[in-house]
């Protein structure tokens, strides 16, 4: 290495040296005269040149030469980082020598001070050593023996993940493009060697052809319509051609023509024969013959993905056409009539909960109807099934794929009304018979036969708004008998509670044992109209044994306890029930109470 001639500088006392400070990108240089001198530091990454200040009092003598070059750790840390990043792999001596050379070359000083020059050299090397240790501690560089390798500036986890994802996608795209280029090259080699083999056989059989009939590679073929007007201009050296067409035209290169002549041994397709594969491998070196199998496997994989995508699109199109078209259902046989789906959407109730802005819309998610909610005797009536039975559900679509269209089971309809007046949705007699929430057994035979409510659950029905009573079918289970209003001392009627009682024929005394009695009592919320969603459960029916040994005090205590229970239940029923609670009761009915009449 050639020795470096360092420029001299004038030695100064420590108290007369320029004091340098860095603050917000500006350097403030304190001159010996006491006047500050500042200049803008535009970029710390660019090489900095230290300007020589003018002498004191405007003199330009040798004794007035001053230097404002920085020698701090912050400055040399930036320089060291730039040097290591630029080289990638370096060592301590190389970085220190280059920084020392740059430092003294950027300071033009006419006089030489050997002592000061030696001090600055040691100071710079010490700063470089400290900067390398800082970068090593921050994991920006790595050190192996004397070699120093650049890693990179630290970043956050999200930035590092995004950078790695971009790098991964970029490399995957590069690998994919290189694989395609490799496949094209393999096909070109096979095509060219197959063409050479065919020409050799033809020349051996028919002799060498004339020069006018030989088409040399590479070439281009341009074809267009027979009636098209083509204008062609050729340069003097026949290196440039200018074509003008008045109709569409196509351009084919030599490789495309060779593939159309089947000289690529059908490797561009997915089903080459074993003989063609063997011929193609014979044209390649032994080290590259496995690429033929990889090309065929990749072609088959791409073709399978395209076929799968096409099937999915076709299935989606078929489902959409099935939903949009008015399907004509075929009446199923007796065996198909008993088939029911595991779950179905209750569309009317779900739409009501979704459209009701005052309720919680999350209650509409996943409202289903179970199998026992479907009545078995759906074919009792002779009425034709209309479009109200054509409901959509993913379960029905999955069940009807690749099967003939079938009539779906009847779905219960639950209507919740918010405005006053009678129910807007009136059901047909057939639907009313199916969806009646109680048994069709007459009341006088219910106790004797031991019949219970439909689906072995509590009796539930909605109380409509308005004073107009709904049309009640024949054979109702119970009726509401209002009591006469009692007048208070203020002349205002009391809010008298209503009692739900059974008809006279519904109570049978021959089933009771001596000393037993039937207690039937149910308190309904007084007044009206009731809010939508109010549910009336079945009447409390219990067989109570008369206890003649009970003292009067015990009788009073028992009576008070019963009154408290009734008051608590009355307060609960006075609270309006939301649509979400009604949906929950419909979806998950309460467990059945013990039937004392069985």
Curated annotation (Swiss-Prot):
What InterPro entries would the database entry show? E2F-DP_heterodim, E2F_WHTH_DNA-bd_dom, TF_DP_C_sf, Transc_factor_DP_C, Transcrpt_fac_DP, WH-like_DNA-bd_sf, WH_DNA-bd_sf
Q: Any idea where this protein resides?
A: Nucleus
Superkingdom of the organism of origin = Eukaryota
**UniProt GO MF annotations:** DNA binding; DNA-binding transcription factor activity, RNA polymerase II-specific; RNA polymerase II-specific DNA-binding transcription factor binding
Signal peptide positions (record):
none
Q: Quick one: where's region Disordered?
A: 1-73, 435-457, 573-598
Determine if Transcription is one of this entry's keywords. yes
The UniProt entry's GO biological process terms, in alphabetical order, are:
gonad development; negative regulation of Ras protein signal transduction; negative regulation of vulval development; positive regulation of cell cycle; programmed cell death; regulation of apoptotic process; regulation of cell division; regulation of cell fate specification
Q: When this gene is knocked out, what is seen?
A: Uncoordinated movements, also known as an Unc phenotype, most likely due to defective cell cycle progression defects in the Pn.a neuroblast lineage. No obvious vulval development defects. Programmed cell death defect in a ced-3 n2427 mutant background. Double knockout with the n433 mutant of the synthetic multivulva class A protein lin-15A results in a multiple vulva (Muv) phenotype. RNAi-mediated knockdown results in reduced postembryonic intestinal cell divisions.
Instruction: Locate the compositionally biased regions of type Polar residues.
Output: 13-22
- SMART domains cross-referenced by the UniProt entry: DP, E2F_TDP
Family in the record: Belongs to the E2F/DP family.
Q: What does this protein do?
A: Synthetic multivulva class B (synMuvB) protein. SynMuvB proteins are required to repress the induction of vulval development by Ras signaling and probably act by forming the multiprotein DRM complex that represses transcription. May also negatively regulate vulval development in association with other SynMuv class B proteins such as lin-15A. Can stimulate E2F-dependent transcription.
Quaternary form? Answer: Component of the DRM complex, at least composed of lin-9, lin-35, lin-37, lin-52, lin-53, lin-54- dpl-1 and efl-1. Interacts (via N-terminus) with efl-1. Interacts (via C-terminus) with lin-35 (via C-terminus).
Q: Give the protein's recorded name.
A: Transcription factor dpl-1
* Organism of derivation: Caenorhabditis elegans
């Amino acid at each position: 290495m050639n020795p470096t001639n360092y420029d001299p500088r004038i030695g100064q006392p420590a108290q007369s040296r320029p004091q340098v400070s860095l603050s917000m990108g500006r350097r403030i240089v304190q001159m010996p005269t006491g006047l500050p001198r500042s200049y803008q530091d535009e970029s710390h990454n660019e090489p900095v040149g230290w300007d020589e200040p003018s002498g004191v009092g405007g003199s330009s003598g040798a004794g007035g030469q001053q230097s404002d070059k920085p020698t701090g750790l912050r400055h040399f840390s930036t320089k060291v980082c730039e040097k290591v990043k630029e080289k990638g792999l370096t060592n301590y001596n190389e970085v220190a020598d280059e920084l020392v050379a740059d430092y003294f070359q950027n300071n033009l000083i006419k006089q030489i001070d050997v002592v000061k020059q030696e001090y600055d050299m040691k100071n710079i090397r010490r700063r470089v050593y400290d900067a390398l240790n800082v970068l090593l501690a921050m994991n920006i560089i790595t050190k192996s023996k004397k070699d120093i390798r650049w890693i990179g500036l630290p970043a956050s986890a999200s930035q590092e993940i995004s950078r790695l994802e971009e790098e991964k996608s970029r490399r995957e795209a590069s690998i994919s493009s290189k694989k395609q280029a490799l496949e094209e090259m393999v096909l070109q080699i096979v095509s060219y060697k197959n063409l050479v083999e065919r020409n050799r056989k033809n020349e051996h059989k028919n002799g060498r052809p004339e020069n006018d009939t030989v088409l040399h590679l590479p070439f281009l073929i341009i074809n267009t319509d027979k009636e098209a007007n083509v204008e062609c201009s050729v340069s003097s050296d026949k290196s440039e051609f200018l074509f003008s067409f008045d109709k569409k035209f196509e351009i084919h290169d030599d490789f495309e023509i060779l593939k159309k002549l089947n000289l690529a041994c059908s490797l561009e397709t997915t089903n080459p024969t074993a003989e063609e594969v063997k011929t193609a491998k014979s044209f390649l070196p032994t080290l590259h013959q496995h690429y033929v199998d990889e090309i065929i496997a990749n072609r088959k994989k791409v073709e399978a993905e395209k076929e799968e995508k096409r099937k999915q699109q076709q299935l989606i199109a078929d489902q959409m056409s099935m939903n949009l078209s008015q399907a004509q259902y075929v009446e199923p046989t007796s065996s198909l009539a008993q088939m029911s789906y595991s779950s179905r959407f209750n569309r009317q109730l779900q739409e009501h909960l979704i459209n009701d802005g005052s309720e919680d819309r999350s209650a509409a998610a996943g409202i289903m109807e179970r199998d026992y909610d479907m009545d078995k005797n759906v074919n009792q009536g002779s009425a034709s099934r209309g479009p109200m039975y054509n409901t959509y559900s993913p379960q029905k679509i999955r069940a009807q794929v690749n099967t003939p269209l079938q009539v779906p089971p009847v779905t219960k309809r639950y209507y919740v009304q918010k405005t006053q007046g009678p129910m807007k949705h009136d059901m047909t007699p057939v639907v009313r018979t199916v969806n009646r929430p109680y048994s069709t057994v007459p009341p006088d035979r219910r106790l004797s036969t031991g019949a219970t409510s439909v689906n072995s659950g509590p009796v539930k029905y909605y109380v409509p708004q308005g004073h107009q009573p709904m049309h009640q079918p024949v054979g109702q289970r119970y009726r509401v008998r209002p009591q006469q209003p009692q007048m208070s001392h203020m002349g205002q009627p009391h809010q008298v509670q209503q009692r739900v009682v059974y008809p006279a024929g519904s109570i049978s005394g021959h089933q009771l044992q001596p000393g037993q009695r039937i207690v039937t009592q149910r308190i309904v919320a007084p007044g009206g109209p009731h809010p939508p969603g109010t549910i009336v459960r079945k009447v409390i029916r219990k067989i109570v044994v008369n206890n003649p040994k009970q003292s009067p005090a015990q009788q009073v205590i028992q009576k008070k306890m019963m009154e408290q229970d009734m008051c608590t239940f009355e307060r609960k029923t006075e609270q309006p029930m939301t649509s979400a609670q009604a949906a929950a009761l419909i979806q998950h009915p309460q467990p059945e109470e013990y039937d004392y009449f069985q």
